[in-house]
């Protein structure tokens, strides 16, 4: 939309003229068996509340839903306790007890017709596990790339670890569906 006059209307509101080039943004789009009400897609991004204050993250996404977004995603969500990035705070979906707070978030995303998405993450070489004290797992045995320069060393994953990682993603995906999410992004 573009302003049709600099001064606006007599009522003091700006007059907007429709620009047909942008109509495609307001069209529905099919994603597999689902349909998004428009093409406005809120990518996964953190707000700092994470598991400590999931209600703040839910309310932030509720505002986006009210604003008319077609697809709204959570922030990066840790899906296993061997992949946490303390001191940074993210959402968690380690076990079933994490489902209720994420269910509330999915419900708030959907209240105005948006599709709710969750990003499931395994931080690997970026996860120092300061909270859980687990030895980090990564493709290779290298120092963890933290922002705090702490001396943490990753263990190279073997075939058993890779099978476990796949199982952890499957379990987290099932929990995501139970929580009411429509879309899942693996990271």
Model-inferred region functions:
Residues 69-80, 136-144, 183-186:
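Short coil-to-beta-strand
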Residues 116-118, 177, 184-186:
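Active-site regions of oxyanion-processing enzymes, predominantly non-cytosolic
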Residues 121-181:
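Non-globular sequence segments
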């Amino acid at each position: 939309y573009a302003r049709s006059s600099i001064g606006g209307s007599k009522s003091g509101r700006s007059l907007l003229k429709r620009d047909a080039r942008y109509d495609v943004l307001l069209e529905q789009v099919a994603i597999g068996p689902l349909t998004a009400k428009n093409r406005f897609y809120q990518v996964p991004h953190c707000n700092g509340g994470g598991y400590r204050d999931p209600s703040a993250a839910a309310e932030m996404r509720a505002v986006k839903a009210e604003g008319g977004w077609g697809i709204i995603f959570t922030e990066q969500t840790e899906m296993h306790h061997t992949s946490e990035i303390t001191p940074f705070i993210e959402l968690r979906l380690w076990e079933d007890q994490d489902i209720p707070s994420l269910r509330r978030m999915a419900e708030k995303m959907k209240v105005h017709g948006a599709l709710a998405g969750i990003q499931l993450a395994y931080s690997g070489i970026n996860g120092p596990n300061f909270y859980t004290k687990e030895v980090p797992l990564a493709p290779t045995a290298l120092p963890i790339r933290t922002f705090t320069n702490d001396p943490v060393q990753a263990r190279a994953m073997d075939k058993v670890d890779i099978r476990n990682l796949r199982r952890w993603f499957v379990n987290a995906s099932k929990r995501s569906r139970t929580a009411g999410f429509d879309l899942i992004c693996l990271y």
